[in-house]
């Protein structure tokens, strides 16, 4: 697997998204690296992480691997194979995901994912206040899948918001 930097990618193939949370950067960072929290929120609508498939080693070079299963049709599954390549608590998580082959094994095709967390003023459904601005950068992704990918992330962040609100 050949590595690359997000900055070296064609801008048309890079998805960027900004989301604001009424939570601290540390709380959000923990939700990405704590297995007990991660399985509660991650996944697009109607998809769940299968808990016993999760391997989460939150160190540079560590693995983040799991299978997501469709809630209404369990025959639909999606394996995920990632490696942490950069971590700076509670500000940065960066992965490289090896896309699965048709047989469900990791391939040599890599996609980068960077999550940056910055404390600041957040505007949420509850109003304006102290919170965290999350900046997501992902690619290379063909432009045709940007909308679907963004919808999946927004669905996941609805779950993360519910988890964070429940812990208050």
What are these regions (language model features)?
Residues 157-168:
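Short amphipathic alpha-helical signal-transduction/dimerization elements
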Residues 19, 53-54, 79-86, 110-125:
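Hydrophobic/aromatic beta-strand elements that line small-molecule binding cavities or substrate pockets
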Residues 12-18, 25-27, 63, 79, ...:
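Intrinsic-disorder/low-complexity, polar/charged segments enriched in Ser/Thr/Lys/Arg/Asp/Glu/Gln
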Residues 94-154:
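Beta-strand/loop substructures that line and gate deep hydrophobic ligand-binding cavities in soluble
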Residues 9-11, 56, 74-78, 105-109, ...:
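A generic structural micro-feature
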């Amino acid at each position: 697997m050949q590595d690359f930097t997000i900055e070296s990618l064609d801008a048309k193939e890079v998805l960027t998204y900004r989301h604001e949370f009424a939570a601290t950067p540390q709380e959000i960072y923990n939700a990405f690296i704590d297995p007990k929290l991660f399985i509660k929120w991650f996944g697009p609508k109607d998809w769940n992480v299968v808990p016993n498939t999760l391997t989460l080693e939150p160190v540079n070079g560590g693995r983040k691997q799991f299978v997501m299963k469709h809630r209404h049709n369990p025959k639909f599954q999606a394996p995920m194979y990632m490696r942490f390549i950069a971590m700076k608590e509670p500000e940065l998580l960066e992965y490289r995901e090896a896309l699965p082959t048709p047989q469900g094994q990791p391939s040599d095709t890599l996609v980068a994912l960077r999550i940056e967390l910055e404390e600041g003023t957040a505007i949420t459904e509850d109003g304006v206040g102290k919170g965290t601005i999350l900046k997501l950068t992902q690619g290379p992704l063909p432009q045709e899948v940007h909308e679907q990918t963004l919808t999946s992330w927004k669905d996941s962040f609805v779950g993360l918001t519910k988890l964070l609100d429940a812990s208050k």
